[in-house]
């Protein structure tokens, strides 16, 4: 069993939620030291959660906001003991993008490659 080097917190928005997500996020962010690596990962650029998190960046300039969340991205971020450099973060994002694969197309191409080899 591998434990994550960094703590992971999840915030969710519900239709009947009375507390804005920015209030909950601020409460969490206030618990971090200035030198802590903090990554906020959201699902969709331009979505309501991403837009709300964008409003926090002027108050928390050390926070990295990344949209387009997938498991590969979150696991890579959480498994690092130290803050990533900008280049390392860019590589992490590129690797996460590469994990988005149309498996049907992958199988179709593999079958076609086998036919071509005959």
PLM regions and their residue ranges:
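N-terminal small/polar loop signature for handling phosphorylated ligands or for N-terminal nucleophile
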Residues: 23-35
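Short coil/turn segments at beta-strand junctions that form active-site/ligand-binding loops
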Residues: 35-37, 61-62
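Short, small-residue-biased leader/transition segments that mark boundaries at the very start
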Residues: 2-6
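Short Gly/Thr/Asp-enriched flexible loops that form oxyanion-binding sites at enzyme active sites
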Residues: 49-60
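Short acidic DE-rich linear segments
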Residues: 111-118
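Short, acidic/small-residue loops that bind anionic groups at enzyme active sites
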Residues: 59-77
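Short beta->alpha junction loops
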Residues: 10-19
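Short, glycine-/small-residue-rich phosphate/pyrophosphate-handling segment
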Residues: 80-106
